[in-house]
Amino acid sequence: MLPSFIFVYSLLATATATSPDWPEPWPSHWREPGSDLFPNQQVHLAVEEAGTGSGCRISNITSNEMAKGRTIVDFPLYAVGSLEEPKLQPLNSSGGEQWEFDGVSEDGMQSFIFGFYRDPNYAILGTGNLRVSIEFGFEDRTRFSEVYYAQRSVVETCSLGTRGLWVDKEAGWKFSFLVDAAMQEAIITLDSDTVKGRIIITSRAKPLAADGSTWPAENASTVTIPYYYWSQPIPAGTVETNVEIKGKLIKWKGMGGHERFWSSFSWFTCMRSLQAVRAMLGPYVLSYFSFTSNLIPDLTHQSVVLFHDGAVVFRSTLGTPSETEDYATVTKTYGGATTGTLKDKVTGFQLELVSPSKMRHYTFFVEHLNVGFEYILGEGVGGSGFSSQSRGGHVGLDQHEGVALTEALTFPKNSPLFRSNYV
C-alpha cells in the first residue's frame, strides 16, 4: 500500500480575468467522508478547498495556443498523481491528448461516445486544436454525430477532482466534464443548440494503468507502444443518460466508462491499429485494450483485466498461451447480424482469460447489436464502435449476461491526410 501523498499545487497557467463559466459546481457528496467506493485509494490534497484559489492547478489555453519553436514537452510515464490532469503543458505542435467518455444502454441498442481533445493533429479536420466529438447511436439504428472546435479549453485539478470545459462563447456552446479525485464518478454536461443534457457514470472498478496495474501504483506504467500512453480512470460502471437531441429526449441507463489517451506524436504516427472491449455483466467488469505500433514492426501491447465485485481476479499483458504465466487470447468473431461498412466485417469477440497457476479459466463472448460510430479513412479501413451484448464467466461456474462496447481502429497505409510527424 502506498503512503498517502499530499500534493501542494501551484498555478500552471493563469486564467483569464474572469473565472471559467462552469456549468455546475462540484457535487456536494464528493465532500462527504467515506463517499468513495474505494476509500483507501490515494486522494490528492490541495492547499485549499476546490475553487479558483491557489489550491487548484489550472490549465487554460486558447484554440491555437502552443509552445513556440521545437520545444520538447515531457510528461510522466507512471500511474501516480492525477490521471485526469493535462499531460502536455504547454501543448506543442506534435503531441496531443484526449479525455474520452462512453456508454451503452442496458439493452445494448443505444450508445454514446464523447471525445474532449487538445490535439493540433486534428486541425486538418477543422479549426484549431481544441476538438469535441459527440456521437450517439439510437435503437432505431440511426446515429447522431457532431464535431465542435472550441475557442478555449480550461482544465482545473483541485482536491475534490478534475473538471474540464471546452467552450465557444461566440457560438454559444460549451461542453464539460467533472471526475472526482478517486476517479469513481464522472459527470458530463452538454450544452449546444442541438444537444443538451447531463450524464453520470459511477464506477464499479478501480482505475487502471496500461500494464494492468490499479491506480495508484508507484511502478505502474502508462506506456503502451512507443510514444503512446493510456490509462482507464473508469474501466466500467453504471451510467445514467439524460439528454435532449434536437428536441427529442434520450433517457436510459446502462454501462459507462472513461479513458485517457496522450501521445508524443499523432495517433497515426505512433499507431497502426487498436482494439478494445469494455464489458459489464453480473459481478464482472472486463477491460481489454490492444495497440499495434506503426513505428516498430510486429510490436503489440495488450492489457486484459477482470474485476469481480470490484476486486481484480485476473490481469495479464500476455496475448499468447503459456503453461506457467497468466494470458488472454482475444479472437474476432464473424457471421453475426450486426457489422459496419468497413472491409473487416467483424461481428464480435471471444476472450479467453487463463491463469495456469491459479487454475482459473474465464470465457467471455461479445456480440455486436448496433453501430455506435464509424469513420471511413480510406483503403477500406477506419474506426468503428459497436454497442453489444456480453455473456460469460468462469468455466464450469455461473454464467452471466450484460452489455459491452467494442472499438476498432486501423489507419490506411497511404493517405495524404495521415502523414507521420515523427521528429
From Swiss-Prot:
<comment type="pathway">
    <text>Mycotoxin biosynthesis.</text>
</comment>
<feature type="glycosylation site" description="N-linked (GlcNAc...) asparagine">
    <location>
        <position position="219"/>
    </location>
</feature>
<dbReference type="GO" id="GO:0016853">
    <property type="term" value="F:isomerase activity"/>
</dbReference>
<dbReference type="Pfam" id="PF24137">
    <property type="entry name" value="DA_N"/>
</dbReference>
<comment type="function">
    <text>Diels-Alderase; part of the gene cluster that mediates the biosynthesis of the mycotoxin pyrichalasin H, a tyrosine-derived cytochalasan that inhibits the growth of rice seedlings, but also inhibits lymphocyte capping and actin polymerization and alters cell morphology. Pyrichalasin H is indicated as the responsible agent for the genus-specific pathogenicity of M.grisea toward crabgrass. The first step in the pathway is catalyzed by the O-methyltransferase pyiA which methylates free tyrosine to generate the precursor O-methyltyrosine.</text>
</comment>
<keyword id="KW-0413">Isomerase</keyword>
<comment type="similarity">
    <text>Belongs to the Diels-Alderase family.</text>
</comment>
<keyword id="KW-0732">Signal</keyword>
<keyword id="KW-0325">Glycoprotein</keyword>
<feature type="glycosylation site" description="N-linked (GlcNAc...) asparagine">
    <location>
        <position position="60"/>
    </location>
</feature>
<feature type="glycosylation site" description="N-linked (GlcNAc...) asparagine">
    <location>
        <position position="92"/>
    </location>
</feature>
<dbReference type="InterPro" id="IPR054499">
    <property type="entry name" value="DA_C"/>
</dbReference>
<protein>
    <recommendedName>
        <fullName>Diels-Alderase pyiF</fullName>
        <ecNumber>5.5.1.-</ecNumber>
    </recommendedName>
</protein>
<dbReference type="Pfam" id="PF22903">
    <property type="entry name" value="DA_C"/>
</dbReference>
<feature type="signal peptide">
    <location>
        <begin position="1"/>
        <end position="17"/>
    </location>
</feature>
